[in-house]
Regions:
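Glycoside hydrolase catalytic-domain groove-lining segments
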Residues: 46-50, 196, 211-218, 225, ...
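Substrate-binding cleft and catalytic face of glycoside hydrolase catalytic domains
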Residues: 51-194, 199-225
Length: 426
């Protein structure tokens, strides 16, 4: 049997929990529409980016949802045009269905805002601005439930749901023009009433998720992972305070979601310190890094931490830091997800500026960067087989094999081994 494959087991297979490697691809349809030219690592044209991501080893994708996006964001309280704020419910239904149809897991990121929601801004949707706190909570419940029902009907039922984006300081503070006590921020030092208002809102969001998508995992997402760059987070005190408040309020959730951008959050050891704390205090929760990224070229605007002596801004540097993050995360059994933010950005073949330099494609060449391969090593679809032997010679090929080791030219229905990973062909 000349095509019989004998597997060289170079790693131990373990029955660990499912791990997810993926990215937030919320802008992919825009780049496809703009005619972006995507290429593999070795320069072959990519006709379907989602298929390419899956073949590389990604098994989950994240998409953000705004309430009523108008391609606008705020800068110092003033509204400005933002091409990237376009993900309404119809957008997410279409992209979510594409993800599900590929056999990948779908993470939905509710922003509960008309524009970007992060620690610097969490604006209440304009249409909800006049509601009192009780009415706002009820609106949040009905909106969440209806959005999920529509996604299910469209074939885009989420497997994981973020009830808010980077909500370290709460959400739906009010309007950009509000000031003082009218802004319902939830800093560690904020009034207890602000925190009560916030947790009451969260309870309605999570209630709707459990009712409409009972099998989905609920994620609470924050970005207080740095002790050196975030002044209120010495010894991870702000991070600890947030999840303590969630526990005291009996918020129903499954996964702790973290952001980690080394150029904002500092060394890898700072992320690991946050994970260690969470593992000790919240052993019943899984942890995911739902946003991660690092440049392959120049510094990202607003960078506060220079890591370039260890990880230069280059393809090799981006690859190295990704590999080291994956290695660290794999040491922690409670960590089950790693998602690259905006991996699909690619100006090649378009009239886009190419300003963003931390995706997983090089805008100058359109080629996938080396970091993509490293990121995908976090996923748990690996068979534990890192290499194969044919007639005593190690091989690295793109062929498909049955579980008994038989090479097949055209895989049909069933489970196969491809690039050392199990792959289901439907």
């Amino acid at each position: 049997m000349k095509h019989l494959l004998f597997f060289l087991l170079l790693a131990t297979t373990s029955a660990s929990a499912q791990k997810y490697a993926g990215g937030d691809i919320s802008m992919l349809p825009k780049y496809e529409e703009a005619g972006a030219k995507y290429y593999t690592h070795d320069g072959k044209g990519i006709s379907d980016v989602l298929t390419f991501f899956k073949d590389e080893g990604m098994n989950a994708m994240r998409v953000r949802l705004f309430v009523d996006p108008k391609e606008q964001t705020t800068n110092n309280g003033k509204w400005e045009t933002d091409y990237n704020v376009c993900q309404d419910l119809d957008w997410v239904k279409a992209l979510g269905k594409r993800i599900k149809d590929k056999g990948m897991k779908f993470m939905l990121d509710f922003h509960y805002s008309d524009t970007w929601a992060d620690p610097g801004k969490q604006w209440t949707p304009a249409a909800w601005a006049s509601l009192d706190d009780n009415a706002l909570a009820q609106k949040l419940y009905s909106y969440t439930k209806d959005a999920l029902a529509q996604l299910k009907a469209a074939g885009a039922e989420p497997d994981m749901i973020q009830t808010g984006n980077e909500i370290s300081y709460g959400m739906m503070w009010g309007q950009p023009t509000d000031t003082g006590s009218n802004l319902k921020r939830c800093w560690p030092s904020s009034p207890a009433d602000n925190w009560t208002r916030f947790t009451n809102l969260l309870k309605q969001a999570t209630k709707a998720c459990r009712e409409e998508c009972p099998d989905a995992k609920i994620i609470l997402h924050v970005e207080r992972t740095s002790v050196s760059q975030q002044n209120d987070n010495k010894n991870h005190s702000a991070l600890s305070n947030f999840y303590k408040k969630m526990k005291e309020a009996s918020i129903d959730y499954d996964i702790i979601g973290l952001s980690y951008y080394p150029y904002f959050h500092g060394a890898i050891s700072e992320l690991e310190g946050a994970i260690d704390l969470l593992k000790k205090d919240y052993a019943d929760k899984s942890v995911m890094v739902v946003e991660f990224g690092y440049p392959y070229a120049w510094a990202v605007g607003g960078t506060t931490y220079d890591y370039t002596k260890t990880y230069p801004y280059s393809d090799a540097g981006q690859k190295a830091i990704t590999a080291d993050v994956v290695t660290m995360l794999k040491k922690h059994e409670n960590v089950n997800g790693l998602f690259w933010w905006w991996p699909e950005y690619n100006a090649k073949g378009t009239n886009l500026s190419g300003w963003y330099n931390a995706p997983l494609f090089d805008s100058n060449t359109g080629k996938a960067t080396s970091a993509l391969t490293e990121l995908c090593k976090f996923g748990s679809s690996s068979t534990g087989i890192n290499a194969t032997m044919m007639n005593g010679k190690q091989e690295a090929d793109n062929n498909y094999y049955t579980l008994s080791g038989q090479r097949v030219s055209t895989p049909s229905h069933g489970v196969y081994i491809h690039k050392g990973r199990k792959e289901l062909k439907k």
